Amino acid sequence: MMNVSQDVSVGRALLTVLLATCLTSCSGDPGLYPDDVLRLELGLGDRDQVHRVVISGGDRESADPMETVIALGSYVEFVTADWLVHEIIFELDSLSIAARNFLERTDQVASPPLISQDSRYVVYFANGPPGRYPFVLEGNGAPGRGVVVVEAGP
């Protein structure tokens, strides 16, 4: 049988574990926080989620990861890993009419040529409809492909 001081100690330990679990789960994935450049240039903060897709070339253009699943209102940052020229172009013919209209209205259909290592192209899915957003990668090698999947929030 436990005495009162043991009950209090167990209660405090459980409360500490519960608070630690809640704080770490509520803070989000630290890998999705914007870096200093995005904070400065776009004014992003800890509540903004930025998913990074690394673009590289060679015989074939490639995106890593090839599929990126995001919540509505998130950002996707395409970053070049090499000094080759790359361009990201969303496939308008493969999009729903609403998704196509969203990308055209927000002028996010295609990136400018990304010509140096660590060049970035950021797409903001603030009011875009949920769904699949396939894209083509063009550059020095054979074209590559990828997709951004936007999921509706809770």
Question: Regions from the language model: what does each represent?
Answer:
Residues G43-V76:
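N-terminal edge beta-strand
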Residues V10-T16:
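Sec-dependent signal peptide recognition
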Residues G58-M66, D107-Q108, D118-Y121:
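N-terminal post-signal-peptidase region of extra-cytosolic proteins
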Residues I89-T106:
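Short, compositionally biased
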Residues S27-L42, V109-P154:
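Extracellular/periplasmic metallocenter environments
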